[in-house]
């Protein structure tokens, strides 16, 4: 029985191909199919292999029926199911262990059934491409401009000469200049792929070259070897596009460098206080960053559980908490261990390294060794394009945030009584003490401040990094590098150092590769420190020299 | 003076107490030794590899517990001995020695990275014990004391490349990996394979990054640039461990969709995906010999047992866990067949043993100490699971010496008597490695 069904479906697909081809030629405005015809075609989507499903998709698209786009959309999103016994294809929406079913043809709700009775129709990348192309052709005349633009982009990827009539129809109707251009580019791509006249193709090359991006490069490269005018024009266009891209690449490297620099700055700025200002070699600094990231995780977990609506604010809530948690741990470390070790750098190094291991293992025992999922709030997901550079929101916000933290810290140290006392203790401890400053208290608070800042850096880094117990380890070397390079005890040095290293790294990486690039940067720093042991911006003063 | 006396008295008392305790403990362990068969578990529970290896320790504990519920082995209970080599490669060798000579374990299940395996090899050879290694690796090795239950390159990398070529029409390849022995060897094999298939050298881009690399902006944009040469491009990723998460995040951020440039990964499984929002990654691929989404009653049972064991409904299973499942059952069967846990007898009995795997077939141990497995290709779904899009019709036996590398293509391994050689050269007819 089911075999005959399959056969019948296959036959219908073949027939529809033929009929649809005629239809496409004879009457561009697609006719509506009857429910029964459409149903047969839809049921054929549940074929055994990907190739058969692909045929079924094409057959469905050929009908030009306006109900098809929704069915194919559901298929692409994995919402199309086939009954295990009924062999009927339905649109399903998961609701717990059940599926809420809709009829793909009539759009009527069928009811709710256990998902165990249905199998999802599988799609792979090839099918997803076919689906997008099919939906693209079907929705070129949609009322929604966003859909139309997406449709034009999808059609452009197919470069299928058969889409030219549909594109022509759409171009005639289109009013939006931006979408019109995409449609014309899509048409040009299709023309290049067809057996059109040479002059048409040369014009098409000019249209595509106008995009000046990678997509156009990818299309044009294929025609370099074409005979006659077309090949020459394509070669010239490819050279032009390459020049444009090279320029944008330099800009992109600067942006990547600034973005890496801001990450380095965030990671190092807390250390600039504990190591730079206080002179404590704090190997547990990275773990403060890690604790900040875990605080974000816990905050998000609680929000997901109790107030999912607040998710977009989770980072703002996590910021003060991370500062407090990491700061409190910092104060505890200072009071419990480091204050007994002032003036003994080697012991401080070993003790703080031990603390870093303890903190790592404590987090591992409490949260497990696995990465924790820290979500991006909606305002930090996705990207936008500036020319050919795609700027991701998360990186952009981190740059902004790093600069904000930098200036806030600067103000705190330069404009507040606490900052004044801190600088006094750093400059001359005895004298500060004689002036009535409680130096132990200042020590604890300054260390707490440095740790707290590391904590809020962790909140930001949780957005681009793995939140795992090892998070901090990756940053400790980089942080020391930045602080030493920039000049111990100088916040400006940290800023300049971080940005310099970030940009240098990103300009080296394309040529030297990630591994060698990093080595070059290290070698450069070693040489630099030989020449200027106090870094870029050396502090001058009596106590510093001592 | 009196305080001195108290101290001395206290010391004597304590010493006597400690002696007694030691005596008791020795007696206790002697007693235990008669009753149990010890199984060593050598997985990092701290350090960078803990992320992957901790679950393997847990799955071994669960398997041992299940076996004990079934009545143990040879009438004795199994006892797990867990040590922590802390992701420190030389420590693996020390801990292996401790397991074998001090604890007297009958077999060891462990290691993840190739470098940790290489570091314990001499120990297993010297002390003649048995190691089950559950992770996909680069091949080019066959040791008498080691049983490789993970995939060799021909069980993972090569079928994945074939799939991309046939199904996606890929003509341009980015081989991206972490900078250490597994990716470097695998990429060498893949490069030789692709060149042999007629791919032009300029259509292959090879890129290495350090462990834990987190800033992928440049590399992802390089991949994008490489992919805009008009030919369908794919990325074959041997990126290992933590670095995967920021890599996939960056792919999503820069808008590289699986439909445009698919990424097929050999080291990304359910466990690694647990840390990311997979919505932007739908359609990227992974090649393994097992996925949690395999539809099979034995697999359902295994997943249910695992979730119950972890007490967490969100616990996931992955390929190396299945490898331990297969390896442990093979060892149990071989011990039963040999009637003893003696290494020599078990090593001989293991060749040819077949046990059910979790994807509905039977895996058997080949004479080269590698096993037969199906090769599955899966696409990442938005729930962090894999949708299987391709499966080899039969099982594939691991090929330890790659056919595509100079120097290893003439080698075979057969540990059965009379050959009993891990690197027999079929051209020179000699046992002893590369010609």
Predicted regions and their residues:
Chain B
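Extracellular/periplasmic Venus flytrap/periplasmic-binding protein
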Residues: 94, 138-139, 145-254, 293-301, ...
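N-terminal signal peptide c-region/cleavage motif recognized by signal peptidases
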Residues: 27-29
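Periplasmic-binding protein-like
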Residues: 99-111, 132-134, 172-177, 230-241, ...
């Amino acid at each position: 029985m089911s075999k005959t069904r399959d056969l019948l479906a296959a036959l219908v697909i073949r027939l529809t191909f033929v009929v649809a081809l005629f239809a496409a030629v004879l009457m561009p405005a697609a006719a509506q199919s009857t429910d029964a015809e459409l149903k047969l075609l839809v049921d054929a989507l549940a074929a055994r292999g990907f190739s058969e499903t692909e045929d079924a998709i094409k057959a469905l698209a050929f009908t030009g029926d306006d109900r098809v786009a929704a069915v194919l959309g559901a298929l692409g999103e994995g919402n199309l199911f086939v009954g295990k016994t009924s062999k009927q294809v339905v649109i399903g929406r998961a609701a717990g262990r059940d599926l809420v079913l809709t009829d793909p043809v009539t759009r009527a709700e069928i009811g709710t059934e256990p998902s165990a009775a249905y199998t999802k129709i599988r799609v792979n990348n090839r099918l997803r491409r076919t689906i997008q192309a099919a939906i693209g052709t079907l929705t070129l005349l949609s009322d929604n401009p966003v859909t139309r633009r997406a449709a034009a982009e999808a059609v452009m990827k197919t470069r299928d000469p058969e889409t030219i009539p549909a594109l022509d129809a759409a171009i005639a109707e289109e009013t939006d200049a931006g979408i019109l251009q995409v449609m014309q580019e899509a048409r040009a791509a299709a023309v290049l792929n067809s057996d059109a006249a040479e002059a048409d193709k040369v014009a098409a090359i000019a249209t595509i070259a106008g995009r000046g991006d990678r997509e156009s490069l990818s299309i044009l490269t294929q025609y370099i070897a074409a005979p006659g005018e077309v090949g020459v024009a394509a070669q010239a266009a490819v050279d032009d596009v390459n020049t444009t891209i090279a320029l944008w690449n330099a800009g992109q490297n600067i942006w990547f460098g600034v973005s890496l620099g801001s990450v380095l700055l965030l990671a190092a700025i807390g250390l600039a206080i504990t190591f730079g200002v206080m002179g404590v070699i704090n190997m547990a600094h990275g773990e403060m960053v890690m604790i900040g990231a875990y605080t974000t995780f816990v905050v998000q977990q609680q929000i997901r559980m109790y107030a999912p609506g607040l998710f977009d604010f989770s980072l703002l809530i996590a910021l003060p908490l991370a500062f407090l948690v990491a700061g409190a741990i910092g104060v505890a470390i200072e009071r419990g261990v480091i204050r007994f070790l002032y003036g003994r750098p080697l012991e401080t190094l070993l003790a703080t390294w031990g603390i870093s291991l303890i903190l790592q293992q404590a987090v591992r025992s409490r949260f497990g060794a696995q990465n924790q999922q820290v979500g991006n709030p909606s305002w930090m997901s996705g990207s936008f394009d500036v020319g050919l550079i795609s700027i991701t929101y998360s990186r952009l916000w981190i740059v902004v945030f790093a600069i904000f933290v930098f200036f806030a810290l600067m103000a705190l140290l330069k404009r507040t009584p606490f900052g004044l006392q801190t600088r006094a203790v750093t400059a001359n401890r005895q004298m500060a003490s004689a002036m009535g400053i409680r130096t132990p208290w200042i020590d604890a608070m300054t260390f707490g401040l440095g740790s707290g800042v590391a904590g809020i850096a962790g909140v930001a880094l949780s957005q681009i990094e793995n939140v795992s117990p090892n998070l901090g380890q990756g940053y400790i070397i980089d942080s020391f590098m930045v602080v030493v390079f920039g000049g111990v005890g100088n916040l400006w040095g940290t800023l300049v150092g971080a940005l310099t290293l970030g940009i240098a790294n990103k300009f080296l990486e394309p040529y030297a590769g990630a591994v060698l690039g990093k080595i070059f940067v290290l070698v450069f720093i070693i040489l630099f420190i030989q020449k200027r042991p106090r870094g870029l911006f050396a502090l001058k003063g009596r106590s510093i020299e001592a | 003076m009196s305080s001195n006396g108290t101290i001395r008295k206290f010391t004597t008392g304590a010493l006597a107490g400690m002696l007694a305790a030691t005596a008791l403990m020795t007696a206790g362990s002697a007693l235990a030794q008669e009753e149990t068969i010890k199984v060593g578990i050598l997985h990092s529970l701290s350090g960078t590899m803990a992320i992957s290896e901790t679950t393997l320790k847990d799955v071994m504990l669960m398997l041992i517990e299940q076996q004990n519920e079934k009545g143990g082995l040879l009438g004795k209970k199994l006892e797990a001995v867990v040590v922590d080599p802390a992701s420190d490669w030389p420590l693996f060798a020390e801990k292996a020695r401790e397991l074998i000579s001090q604890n007297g374990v009958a077999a060891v299940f462990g290691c993840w990275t190739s470098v940790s395996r290489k570091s314990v090899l001499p120990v297993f050879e010297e002390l003649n014990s048995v190691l089950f290694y559950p992770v996909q690796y680069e091949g080019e090795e066959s040791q008498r004391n080691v049983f490789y239950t993970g995939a060799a390159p021909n069980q993972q990398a090569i079928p994945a490349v074939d799939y991309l070529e046939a199904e996606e029409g890929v003509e341009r390849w980015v081989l991206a990996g972490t900078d250490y022995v597994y990716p470097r060897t695998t990429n060498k094999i893949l490069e030789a394979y692709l060149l042999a298939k007629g791919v032009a050298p300029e259509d292959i881009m090879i890129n290495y990054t350090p462990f834990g690399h987190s800033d992928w902006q440049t590399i992802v944009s390089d991949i994008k640039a490489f992919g805009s040469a008009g030919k369908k491009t794919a990325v074959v990723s041997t990126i290992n461990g933590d670095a995967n998460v920021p890599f996939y995040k960056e792919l999503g951020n820069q808008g590289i969709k699986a439909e445009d440039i698919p990424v097929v990964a050999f080291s990304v499984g359910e466990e690694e995906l647990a840390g990311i929002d997979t919505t932007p990654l739908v359609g990227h691929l992974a090649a393994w010999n097992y996925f949690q989404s395999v539809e099979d009653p034995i697999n359902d049972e295994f997943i249910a047992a695992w979730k119950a064991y972890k007490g967490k409904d969100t616990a996931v299973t992955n390929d190396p866990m299945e490898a331990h499942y297969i390896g442990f059952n093979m060892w149990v069967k071989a011990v039963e067949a040999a009637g003893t846990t003696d290494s020599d007898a078990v090593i001989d009995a293991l060749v040819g043993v077949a046990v059910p795997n979790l994807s509905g077939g039977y895996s058997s141990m080949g004479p080269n100490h590698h096993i037969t497995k199906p090769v599955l290709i899966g696409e990442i779904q938005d729930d962090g699971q894999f949708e299987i899009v391709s499966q080899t019709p039969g099982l594939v036996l691991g090929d330890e010496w790659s056919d595509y590398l100079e120097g290893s293509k003439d080698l075979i391994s057969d540990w059965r008597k009379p050959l009993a050689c891990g690197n027999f050269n079929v051209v020179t007819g000699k046992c002893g490695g590369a010609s």
